[in-house]
């Protein structure tokens, strides 16, 4: 029997630093935005086609909870991606490159994103 068999690691035992979680979240939010692009373009087309189609879309957004949820998800992904992207650009410029500063900036992005996402939900509903 081979003594060097693969080991199945329990991924729940790993504790990732907040910088890694933020980076993964930035990639996931970018992917969500990519998947939502057809809906965003459709809504933009409907909103700019005519006054009647804008009014119809406005009424749909006011009364349909699923549409509100979809818009909130798109807006949430956009806000998180924006704040995490600003942090990544600042790090490319040489700011927050040490581990303690990176940890603080990651937590700051999480808090600011959470506040902005909650405010977006309040604004939509």
Curated annotation (Swiss-Prot):
Coiled coil: none
UniProt KW Iron-sulfur keyword: no
Keyword tags: Cell inner membrane, Cell membrane, Electron transport, Heme, Iron, Membrane, Metal-binding, Transmembrane, Transmembrane helix, Transport, Tricarboxylic acid cycle
Membrane association type: Multi-pass membrane protein
Chain segments annotated as transmembrane: 23-48, 66-86, 105-125
Residues where heme binds: 81
Source organism superkingdom: Bacteria
Any Gene Ontology CC annotation: plasma membrane
Cofactor(s) of this protein: heme
NCBIfam families assigned: succ_dehyd_cytB (TIGR02970)
Assembly and oligomerization: Part of an enzyme complex containing four subunits: a flavoprotein, an iron-sulfur protein, plus two membrane-anchoring proteins, SdhC and SdhD. The complex can form homotrimers.
Protein name from the UniProt record: Succinate dehydrogenase cytochrome b556 subunit
């Amino acid at each position: 029997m081979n003594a060097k068999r693969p080991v199945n690691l329990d991924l729940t035992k790993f504790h990732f630093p907040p910088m890694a979680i933020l980076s993964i979240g930035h990639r996931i939010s970018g992917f969500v935005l990519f998947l939502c692009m057809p809906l965003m373009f459709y809504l933009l087309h409907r909103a700019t086609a005519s006054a009647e189609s804008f009014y119809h879309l406005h009424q749909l957004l006011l009364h349909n909870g699923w549409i509100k949820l979809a818009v909130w998800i798109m807006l949430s992904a956009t806000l998180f991606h924006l704040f995490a992207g600003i942090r990544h650009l600042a790090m490319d410029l040489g700011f927050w490159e040490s581990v303690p500063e990176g940890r603080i900036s990651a937590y700051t992005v999480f808090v600011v994103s959470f506040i902005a996402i909650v405010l977006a939900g309040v604004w939509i509903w």
